[in-house]
Curated annotation (Swiss-Prot):
Result of altering residue 90 to A: Impaired phosphorylation and decreased acetyltransferase activity, leading to decreased ability to promote homologous recombination (HR)repair in response to DNA double-strand breaks (DSBs)
Organism: Mus musculus
Localisation per UniProt entry: Nucleus; Chromosome; Cytoplasm; Chromosome, Centromere, Kinetochore
Modifications made to the protein after synthesis: Phosphorylated on Ser-86 and Ser-90; enhanced during G2/M phase. The phosphorylated form has a higher activity. Phosphorylation at Ser-90 by CDK1 or CDK9 is a prerequisite for phosphorylation at Ser-86 by GSK3. Phosphorylation at Ser-86 by GSK3 (GSK3A or GSK3B) activates acetyltransferase and acyltransferase activity. Phosphorylation at Ser-90 by CDK9 promotes KAT5 recruitment to chromatin. Phosphorylation by VRK1 following DNA damage promotes KAT5 association with chromatin and histone acetyltransferase activity.
Xref: SMART domains: CHROMO
Subunit-structure text: Component of the NuA4 histone acetyltransferase complex which contains the catalytic subunit KAT5/TIP60 and the subunits EP400, TRRAP/PAF400, BRD8/SMAP, EPC1, DMAP1/DNMAP1, RUVBL1/TIP49, RUVBL2, ING3, actin, ACTL6A/BAF53A, MORF4L1/MRG15, MORF4L2/MRGX, MRGBP, YEATS4/GAS41, VPS72/YL1 and MEAF6. KAT5/TIP60, EPC1, and ING3 together constitute a minimal HAT complex termed Piccolo NuA4. The NuA4 complex interacts with MYC. Interacts with ATM. Interacts with JADE1. Interacts with PLA2G4A/CPLA2, EDNRA and HDAC7. Interacts with the cytoplasmic tail of APP and APBB1/FE65.
Cross-link Glycyl lysine isopeptide (Lys-Gly) (interchain with G-Cter in SUMO2) mapped to chain: 430
Entry's family note: Belongs to the MYST (SAS/MOZ) family.
Gene Ontology process terms (BP): apoptotic process; cellular response to estradiol stimulus; cellular response to glucose starvation; cellular response to glucose stimulus; DNA damage response; DNA damage response, signal transduction by p53 class mediator; DNA repair-dependent chromatin remodeling; double-strand break repair via homologous recombination
The protein's name: Histone acetyltransferase KAT5
Catalytic activities: L-lysyl-[histone] + acetyl-CoA = N(6)-acetyl-L-lysyl-[histone] + CoA + H(+); L-lysyl-[protein] + acetyl-CoA = N(6)-acetyl-L-lysyl-[protein] + CoA + H(+); (2E)-butenoyl-CoA + L-lysyl-[protein] = N(6)-(2E)-butenoyl-L-lysyl-[protein] + CoA + H(+); 2-hydroxyisobutanoyl-CoA + L-lysyl-[protein] = N(6)-(2-hydroxyisobutanoyl)-L-lysyl-[protein] + CoA + H(+)
Pfam families in alphabetical order: MOZ_SAS, Tudor-knot, zf-MYST
EC number, as in UniProt: 2.3.1.48, 2.3.1.-
Sample GO molecular function, one term: DNA-binding transcription factor binding
Length: 513
């Protein structure tokens, strides 16, 4: 059995932790750092195959020293492409070599006629009106903004019809087929963390949200040990205290503080409560800077130009990076617009979440980063942010898609939103002359502003596309219909287009943003 003094960085051993059921478990963890406070050693551990947000400092009493694995000496191997620091390519980010070599793209059906009928008792289904935070990111932008973005390729789970192939849709008895069955070719994580989006997401005919104890998302964003560790202990923002999930590049002198104090209106940071109180006597903001372009009830959205409000935008990015691991933070906020969602009370407009987007996007991205702050998660705000981004796309007359890669929680939220939105369209179709209703992929995309590729991938994800008697059909099972109705009953927050006061700008004609 090893001694406590023998534990070094890189060691792996079981560590005691409490799971979501308040039960003890001993997952394997890696020691990332060791520190000594008043003669007492603390160890910063990362639980293997769990999300980094669960990393923590522990004492030696929680370590199983009997099963310790010491780090092996690394063999000298040539680096990738001869470049120091190169990492193995990620299968989630790289395009298959065969596709690159041939210069071909995956076939995407554009004009598919979808025909279907619903059970008689469901022909007239009242439209449900009515979601939690989301954790995806800001001027947090992907690592390669100016270079060509890598494409995330997902193998189709069901046959993809050609561009002109007709499709019909039939209902199925709920007992005949469950909503979504895992099939070869569909990437599906068995253990994913799910605290960001709505709990009701699992009820719309798609798999239940991942468990609370972590995900299989790999720590590939940063190689150096500093950025793999949380550096801020606690953040006080208004009436909330937040425990950061990830590293954020706040000034080094602030990382030793027990609490970092932020002004909830301008997001400036201070070392102490006294500093914050002095700042509040001078800060005259009671809402985010910029124009209020939406208000309904207590919910408002403010549009903020990253060039005109640089300080606020940078502070927003620093805060968001505490809860986003898959983006790189840049301080050049000029090319971005930020849309901040707030909740109003007698003291002012309190930030709930936000999303950012490029002023000019050649890839039709309508969201660069998106986040709902932890205190407001699981309350429907995640889908509200997503819905608002697509509402802006409708006004702009464009289809849009979120920038890749999405976080695990962001992907959950978008999958749920796409599924509910598309099912809402399909179930609202009325038959003409006794024939089954018909709709094309293009029409769905135009109605919802969801990009065609996302429409197709969602239909595949829900396992709705089938081949029947020489044509492609959409099959809505009883489980899908029932699950969708239950989900829509829980979705109380919706965007009202009548409350949106937004005029899109043509940034291509403005030279410098």
């Amino acid at each position: 059995m090893a001694e406590v003094g023998e534990i070094i960085e890189g060691c792996r051993l079981p560590v005691l932790r409490r799971n979501q059921d308040n039960e003890d478990e001993w997952p394997l963890a890696e020691i990332l750092s060791v520190k000594d406070i008043s003669g007492r050693k603390l160890f910063y551990v990362h639980y293997i195959d769990f999300n980094k947000r669960l990393d923590e400092w522990v004492t030696h009493e929680r370590l199983d020293l009997k099963k310790i694995q010491f780090p092996k000496k690394e063999a000298k191997t040539p680096t990738k492409n001869g470049l120091p620091g190169s990492r193995p390519g990620s299968p989630e980010r790289e395009v298959p070599a065969s596709a690159q070599a041939s210069g071909k793209t995956l076939p995407i059906p554009v004009q598919i006629t979808l025909r279907f009928n619903l059970p008689k008792e469901r022909e007239a289904i009242p439209g449900g009106e009515p979601d939690q935070p989301l954790s995806s990111s800001s001027c947090l932008q992907p690592n390669h903004r100016s270079t060509k973005r890598k494409v995330e390729v997902v193998s189709p789970a069901t046959p993809v019809p050609s561009e002109t192939a007709p499709a019909s849709v039939f209902p199925q008895n709920g007992s005949a087929r469950r909503a979504v069955a895992a099939q070869p070719g569909r990437k599906r994580k068995s253990n994913c963390l799910g605290t960001d989006e709505d709990s009701q997401d699992s009820s719309d005919g798609i798999p239940s949200a991942p468990r609370m104890t972590g995900s299989l998302v790999s720590d590939r964003s940063h190689d150096d040990i500093v950025t793999r560790m949380k550096n801020i202990e606690c953040i006080e923002l208004g009436r909330h205290r937040l425990k950061p999930w990830y590293f954020s590049p706040y000034p080094q002198e602030l990382t030793t503080l027990p609490v970092l104090y932020l002004c909830e209106f301008c997001l400036k940071y201070g070392r102490s409560l006294k500093c914050l109180q002095r700042h509040l006597t001078k800060c005259d903001l009671r809402h985010p800077p910029g124009n209020e372009i939406y208000r309904k009830g207590t919910i408002s959205f403010f549009e903020i130009d990253g060039r005109k409000n640089k300080s606020y935008s940078q502070n927003l990015c620093l805060l968001a990076k505490c809860f986003l691991d898959h983006k790189t933070l840049y301080y050049d906020t000029d090319p971005f617009l930020f849309y901040v969602m707030t909740e109003y009370d007698c003291k002012g407009f309190h930030i709930v979440g936000y999303f950012s987007k490029e002023k000019e996007s050649t890839e039709d991205y309508n969201v660069a980063c998106i986040l709902t702050l932890p205190p407001y998660q699981r309350r429907g705000y995640g889908k509200l942010l997503i819905e608002f981004s697509y509402e802006l796309s409708k006004v702009e007359g464009k289809t849009g898609t979120p920038e890749k890669p999405l976080s695990d929680l962001g992907l959950l939220s978008y999958r749920s939103y796409w599924s509910q939105t598309i099912l809402e369209i399909l179930m609202g179709l009325k038959s003409e002359s006794g024939e089954r209703p018909q709709i094309t992929i293009n029409e769905i995309s135009e109605i919802t502003s969801i990009k065609k590729e996302d429409v197709i991938s969602t239909l595949q994800y829900l396992n709705l596309i089938n081949y029947y008697k020489g044509q492609y059909i959409l099959t809505l099972s009883e489980d899908i219909v029932d699950g969708h109705e239950r989900a829509m009953l829980k979705r109380l927050l919706r965007i009202d287009s009548k409350c949106l006061h937004f005029t899109p700008k043509d940034w291509s004609k403005r030279g410098k943003w």
